[in-house]
UniProtKB/Swiss-Prot annotation:
Pfam families for this protein: HGTP_anticodon, TGS, tRNA-synt_2b, tRNA_SAD
InterPro entries per UniProt: aa-tRNA-synt_IIb, aa-tRNA-synth_II, aa-tRNA-synth_II/BPL/LPL, Anticodon-bd, Anticodon-bd_dom_sf, Beta-grasp_dom_sf, TGS, TGS-like
Gene3D superfamilies: 3.10.20.30, 3.30.54.20, Anticodon-binding domain, Bira Bifunctional Protein, Domain 2, Threonyl-trna Synthetase, Chain A, domain 2
Lineage: Bacteria, Pseudomonadati, Thermodesulfobacteriota, Desulfuromonadia, Geobacterales
Superkingdom of the source species: Bacteria
Organism: Geobacter sp. (strain M21)
Reactions accelerated catalytically: tRNA(Thr) + L-threonine + ATP = L-threonyl-tRNA(Thr) + AMP + diphosphate + H(+)
Protein name stated in the entry: Threonine--tRNA ligase
Documented EC number(s): 6.1.1.3
Cofactor field: Zn(2+)
Any GO BP: threonyl-tRNA aminoacylation
Amino acid sequence: MNEINVTLPDGSQRPLPAGASIFDLAASIGAGLAKAAIAGKIDGNLVDLNTPLADGARVEIVTEKSPEALEIIRHSTSHLMAQAVKALFPQAKVTIGPAIETGFYYDFDVDHPFTPEDLEKIEEKMRELAKADLKIERRELTSADAIALFKGMGEDYKVELIEDLGADKVSLYSQGDFVDLCRGPHLPKTSYIKAFKLTSIAGAYWRGDEKRAMLQRVYGTAFGDKKELEAYLARIEEAKKRDHRKLGRELDLFSFNDEVGAGLVIWHPKGAMLRTILEDFERKEHLKRGYDIVLGPQILKTELWQRSGHYENYRENMYFTTVDEQSYGVKPMNCLAHMMIYRSQLRSYRDLPLRYFELGTVHRHERAGVLHGLLRVRGFTQDDAHILCTPDQLDAEIKGVIQFVTEVMGIFGFEFEMELSTRPEKSIGSDDAWELATSALLNALKDSGRPYEINEGDGAFYGPKIDIKLRDALDRRWQCATIQCDFTLPERFDLTYVDADGEKKRPVMVHRVILGAIERFIGVLIEHFAGNFPTWLAPVQATIVTVTDNQIPYAQAAFDKLRAAGIRVQKDFRNEKLGFKIREAQLQKIPYMLVVGDKEVESGMLAPRFRDGKNLESMTPEQFITFIENEVKSYK
């Protein structure tokens, strides 16, 4: 055959010489497309640009503007970094280096920790290798030959990976004298890598196992052009200013203490107030929507965790204690007590749906290496609810939860994205049950009118789920809300209800959180608002500031009125300059400063100014109380 025909995305067919590659196809369409092309898709699968085409293939050309481009660019840049490290530190052993959401990383086994100066040298070497315009070439070897190759190179980690894969053949990529084990695809040449930056260094255990070697993980990022890279780096600098750990200290919200233990938050008065405001908000919103507030114990007998399956599947993340020779597990989740409440009496179909809500504090043994401020802790409180309903009610209940999420995220000013994760290969439950639950989740997503993605096979073994990721002011995604169908617990705990025909039936169960972990959500809020909380959330809503000591009696009376009305107010009557006191209140990000001078004392007024420096009209204490109450009611 001297000629082949391939199908383009628009359905048209294009003839090409036999043996033509995706690059040849791009060149046949136009010089501009050939220049922009970086990879391709054959029958929906991503492949390298120089991959030969078969007759009848459906082909799509991937350019720097394609959705898939960034991952390919970043993955190739991680290989470029590994090549640079091997050139500078020949004794280093390479492990893995994937593309991730914010860029890429590569883990190295080295004799000494990398320094910031090392990063600069590595980055400079990467630029040199990129300019060298090295071809990036793919080849396939038998696993035996690949193992022999990497053993000869002293790359023990690659040998382990190939042995664990258990495949007959593996693919390798080479550029210059550097060879790596990889599925690909990759860019055609190193010169296609134009805009990158190494950002940080961290430690990481090989394969996440604390018993294995500690490696040096180098993080970086890469983009299609320098403009995108510079914009990203500017966002990173802004994120550093907003870091909730930094602001948490500066605003005196919370702390951690090694004497207390890693991952255990100590809430200071202002932080505890912020948390209380959120929890009160949660209770009110749940009661409005027909949830019953419940509370469960912190420890439950180990036999119960064995029955639920947590002991078998989750015990490494649990804490256990023994009381009166009886083993107990500290709860990592709130669901079991809710099961006990349901089982405490006979249930009729007329009782359903039942919606149990608990602000439940749980503890999970997270590895020390993954702990990160409020975003990853060992003790936290979830806005956890479990809905038990009939199969016919499932659609409406899930739609109700999505509407709940939509309304709550709107109050906080967050946009969000949704993903449906479907049945994995290993799962329990009948086909009918999975179909019912997946259909209910999918119908709710469609009815929401919002875009969503489907992650095939990424559900839990006991049921499909919807994950909801909010977007903050820096356009970062945060996993918070989850809606999860569960077939396991109703079965294991023999939950039943009496149907209209008098028969016992199994209820459907939905686990769901709206904000998720309160600690994590507060961390996100701090960074989203940069500590400038809206008035309704601010731990301190106003501070009364005197000009001189002469105004203290009037200012104290005003302070007492505001506090009695429920306004979260503090006072600064120190003998300091007014500008100093105002600046300090601004640094504490307090929404309103109420200045009291001789004029205010004479007129019985307060002189409010917003934290951005804008002056408001003078108000009486009573008027200011009404003003704040209106802001709180409208969630401003």
